[in-house]
Curated annotation (Swiss-Prot):
Functional description taken from the UniProt entry: CRISPR (clustered regularly interspaced short palindromic repeat), is an adaptive immune system that provides protection against mobile genetic elements (viruses, transposable elements and conjugative plasmids). CRISPR clusters contain sequences complementary to antecedent mobile elements and target invading nucleic acids. CRISPR clusters are transcribed and processed into CRISPR RNA (crRNA). Acts as a dsDNA endonuclease. Involved in the integration of spacer DNA into the CRISPR cassette.
Any one biological process term the GO annotation gives: maintenance of CRISPR repeat elements
Binding residues annotated for Mn(2+), in chain numbering: E149
Full protein name: Putative CRISPR-associated endonuclease Cas1 2
Taxonomy, superkingdom: Archaea
Signal peptide: none
Keyword check for Nuclease: yes
Family matches, as InterPro entries: Cas1 (IPR050646), CRISPR-assoc_Cas1 (IPR002729), CRISPR-assoc_Cas1_C (IPR042206), CRISPR-assoc_Cas1_N (IPR042211)
Membership in a protein family: Belongs to the CRISPR-associated endonuclease Cas1 family.
Biological classification of the source: Archaea, Methanobacteriati, Methanobacteriota, Stenosarchaea group, Methanomicrobia
Listed EC numbers: 3.1.-.-
UniProt enzyme class: hydrolase
């Protein structure tokens, strides 16, 4: 549920969402994950009903920034996996995440250059990116992996900025608050992807804040989702922007931030709900757990 102003209530079998004069009833049995983005009113009894039925609830700011989650008790009962997670040697996991994050971006850029034209790249730019990818195997410190992965991400977003209309004023990926609609759209998509990853991580009894390449409250989630952003979010966001479907009346710029209007948010929810591959994410968590138990070698599954 995105936007603002929805009223959400429930009975024992259904939740009812009233938003802008429209009423939608959803059977609770059809839900496994309920994502709330933006400011809405939800009854505490509805939260109770959802959690009792095993539904994972995620909360994000209006721009997609993850805030937190509510999970049923059995999502976090077992500590065995978290102990394995925290005692595992981090380097091989960090290397796998950095390697796939970089390669996925290089592949995406090559695809854009093939479809749109090589003029989107400056001379030698692709060689620099592939050189960074080759350097990874020679690095012995996780801090070095993190630095190179960030450099590639920065270059990647600068190249993406050349694919879309300059009227959107997007030059690079920035931190909050987002002042242009492109950063706002990326952030919204990443919030949805983050929520899907967090649900899978918590469902696997892992600690979302204990990562191997990244640091912070969502470190493990970031480790994984950075590998999937180009295919699951960016590709579809760029397609949406290049299609001309985002008009100037679809967003509002203020001196503080860029606000996407509800009709754009609804379209993005529909777009990214189809592009985020939850089955793949769940399988990835299984692979990680098997690796932590010594039953398999860790690798990132490609979308």
């Amino acid at each position: 549920m995105g936007g603002f102003g929805a009223h959400i209530k429930s009975n024992r079998t259904e939740i009812t969402i009233q938003h802008k004069g429209k009423i939608t009833d959803i059977p609770i049995k059809d839900l496994s994950h309920f994502l709330l983005i933006g400011g809405h009113t939800i009854q505490t009894s509805t939260i109770t009903s959802l959690v009792k039925e095993g539904v994972f609830i995620s909360f994000c700011e209006s721009d997609g920034e993850p805030v937190g989650y509510i999970s049923p008790y059995d999502y976090s009962l077992f500590k065995e996996i978290q102990n394995l997670q925290k005692t595992a040697a981090p380097y091989s996991y960090a290397l796998a995440c950095a390697n796939e994050s970089i390669k996925s971006r290089i592949l995406a850029i090559e695809k854009y250059a093939e479809e749109i034209g090589p003029e989107i790249l400056f001379s030698g730019e692709l060689d620099i990116l592939t050189g960074y990818a080759k350097e990874l195997e020679n690095m012995v410190l996780i801090e070095e992996l993190r630095r190179i992965e960030q450099l590639v991400r920065d270059m990647y977003y600068e190249i993406l900025g050349r694919l879309i209309s300059p009227t959107y004023l997007f030059k690079r990926r920035t931190s909050r608050p987002y002042l242009d609609p492109v950063n706002a759209i990326f952030s919204f998509g990443y919030g949805m992807l983050s929520s899907a990853c967090t649900r899978a991580v918590i469902g696997g009894h892992l600690d979302p804040g204990h990562g191997y390449l990244n640091r912070g409250n969502q470190a493990l989630v970031q480790d994984l989702m950075n590998c999937w952003k180009p295919k699951m979010i960016d590709n579809h966001a760029i397609g949406f922007l290049r299609s001309g479907r985002l008009h100037q009346n679809g967003y509002e710029r203020t001196k503080d931030r860029c606000i996407l209007h509800d009709e754009v948010i609804e379209e993005l929810i529909h777009l990214f709900s189809k592009s985020i591959q939850e089955e793949l994410i769940n399988t990835q968590i299984d692979v990680l757990i098997q690796s932590l138990r010594g039953e398999a070698q860790f690798s990132i599954i490609k979308p």
